[in-house]
Amino acid sequence: IHTGAKTSAKGGFTTVICMANTSPTVDNIDTLKDNLNRASKEDIRIFQAAAISHSLKGQEEVDMAALKEAGACGFTDDGIPLLNAEFCYKAMEAAKALNVPVSLHEEDPAFIRNNGINHGKVSDELGIYGSPSIAEESLVARDCLLALRSGADVVIQHISSGVSVELVRTYKKLGANLHAEATPHHFSLTEDAVLKHGTLAKMNPPLRTEKDRQQII
């Protein structure tokens, strides 16, 4: 937390939200309060999100009400997708009742053979399959619908696909309370960066095509 706060301030960020996918996982009040206590000693404003599921396994719900009361600003299993649609929907309903956001990492591993690189021309050149955009788009489509039906405030994290962008726009027009965010590298680089920078350009979700980049912008 301390070094993160220092680098955030150096980069011009005066308010940040810490994710819950840490060790230990922020899925209980003791860990949450410990993190918030540490954060309170820093020179920037630091909020803490709590996990949606215990140990980020997507199976057992945390006590959202108790965690919110203890200071959680929202809920996320950041970095790990919620594959069970019913579980995800119930989490949205609970978050809606508490008036807090749910943030979702959208990659269905069933479609992915190699993490970190887009399934496309670059992966073909390297002789691997990679991670196709449908891995993201399929979960974005599902969760946009769940957001519409639940009425929850839902954030689609680090969006990488142009189709995903259009899905969010479509469901926002239908009345869903949706938001999406993109990283600087996803709107400034493409899959071609892997050929130049190697593993430094591999990430989840991966850098995609120029068309995707333009749609994200």
Predicted regions and their residues:
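Structural motif
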Residues: S55-E61
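Histidine/acidic residue-rich metal-binding segments in metalloenzymes
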Residues: E61-I217
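A glycine-rich helix N-cap at a beta->alpha junction
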Residues: N37-I52
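Metal-associated gating/positioning segment near the N- to mid-region
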Residues: I1-A39
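Gly-rich Lys/Arg/Thr-decorated short loops/hinges at beta-loop-alpha junctions or inter-strand turns
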Residues: F13-C18, R45-F47, H119-I128
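Short histidine/acidic/glycine/proline-rich micro-motifs that form metal-
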Residues: N21-T25, I52-S55, P81-L82
